């Protein structure tokens, strides 16, 4: 049975999720509906031409209420209220809620009222039935979870590495810094924002700010609840971020062991989600990398046998968008 998906919100993640669907050639799903309040012409143009990921594969055509990116016509709706999106009329199984505006169970459940069977939210979601990081806790997904959170791009990078360490050498405490590319909520020139640092010009400063990733990693890996803290520094690059994780371990370990553990996970149970790098690369080299997390083995450090540092790269747009589709398939198995 082919899963029928809708994308609601056609910004960075919505567009990249559609591109990932096209590039990965998912045979077990089809995108039947996209909801975006803006003009269809704008959606089609921004899908086809992207400053970060280049031009889309294939030919893009559109009409008044449809767009075709190479897999047949997709109906385009322009509703601002999710309750009015024609999910029922298009037989939508799962909505990928990518607008960034309905990040609570109550708000995103409007999609269910409109006829969708399940909702997958592309962000941390307050009171979600479950938060699932694919490759880390997707085995815990249940049939009765109607609103599922895909967590954040940073949680998707942190959680695989944290799980590998927690399951082997143990984590007593950990601190994560994400050195993060600027995102669409930051201005090009100083502007008002409730976070006075995020109010500043994105491409001109390193900007210390908060991250919810360490809190939500405790939801995904309950054994780490209360053991992790973290912060973010937004830097003047357009895409690709890096998690710098430092933990104290429960037992003695070595640099060699840590790298062996990460390599074994990347080649085994976390293949496709966790990657490894052993070459002298920089952030742009990970643009369009489909992994959630790429551990850079050249940067691993172990001090006094118990203070461990791991660096993990992630394309904060593309990797996360690929996981939206993986989680949709996982949720679809219950339909």
Feature map (PLM): residue ranges:
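C-terminal active-site/capping subdomain that shapes the small-molecule cofactor and substrate pocket
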Residues: 2-3, 230, 242, 246-335
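Short gly/ser/thr-rich secondary-structure transition/capping motifs
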Residues: 76-81, 226-227, 292
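Predominant activation on well-ordered alpha-helical scaffold segments within soluble catalytic domains
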Residues: 18, 109, 159-166, 177, ...
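Glycine-rich beta-alpha junction loops
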Residues: 37-40, 125-126, 152-154, 178-185, ...
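Generic structural signal for well-ordered, non-membrane alpha-helical segments
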Residues: 10, 14, 104, 151-154, ...
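N-terminal Rossmann-like NAD(P) cofactor-binding subdomain of oxidoreductases
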Residues: 1-199, 302, 324-326, 334
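Short clusters of hydrophobic/aromatic residues that line enzyme substrate/ligand-binding pockets
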Residues: 67, 132-134, 147, 189, ...
């Amino acid at each position: 049975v082919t899963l029928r998906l809708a994308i609601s919100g056609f910004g960075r993640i919505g567009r990249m999720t559609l591109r990932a669907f096209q590039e990965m050639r998912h045979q077990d799903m089809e995108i039947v509906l996209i909801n975006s309040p803006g003009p269809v012409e704008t959606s089609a143009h921004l899908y086809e031409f992207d400053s970060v990921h280049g031009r889309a594969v294939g030919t893009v055509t559109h009409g008044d209420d449809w767009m075709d990116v190479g897999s047949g016509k997709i109906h385009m709706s322009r509703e601002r209220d999710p309750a009015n999106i024609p999910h029922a009329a298009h037989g939508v199984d799962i909505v990928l809620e990518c607008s960034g505006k309905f990040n609570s169970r109550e708000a995103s459940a409007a999609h269910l009222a409109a006829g969708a069977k399940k909702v997958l939210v592309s962000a941390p979601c307050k009171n979600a039935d479950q938060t699932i990081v694919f490759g880390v806790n997707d085995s815990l997904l249940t049939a009765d979870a109607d609103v599922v959170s895909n967590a954040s791009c940073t949680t998707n990078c942190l959680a695989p590495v944290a799980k590998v360490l927690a399951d082997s050498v143990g984590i007593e405490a950990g601190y994560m810094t994400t050195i993060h590319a600027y995102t669409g909520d930051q201005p090009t020139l100083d502007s008002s924002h409730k976070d006075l640092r995020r109010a500043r010009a994105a491409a001109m400063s390193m900007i210390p700010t908060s991250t919810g990733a360490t809190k939500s990693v405790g939801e995904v890996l309950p054994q780490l609840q209360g053991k992790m803290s973290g912060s973010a520094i937004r830097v003047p690059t357009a895409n690709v971020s890096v998690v710098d994780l430092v933990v104290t371990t429960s037992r003695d370990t070595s640099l060699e062991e840590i790298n062996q553990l990460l390599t074994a996970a990347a080649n085994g149970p976390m293949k496709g989600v966790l990657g490894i790098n052993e070459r002298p690369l920089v952030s742009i080299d990970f643009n369009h990398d489909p992994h959630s997390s790429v551990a850079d083995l050249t940067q691993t450090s172990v001090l006094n046998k118990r203070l461990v540092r791991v660096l993990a790269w992630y394309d904060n747009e593309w990797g996360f968008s690929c996981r939206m589709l993986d989680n949709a398939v996982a949720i679809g198995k219950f339909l």
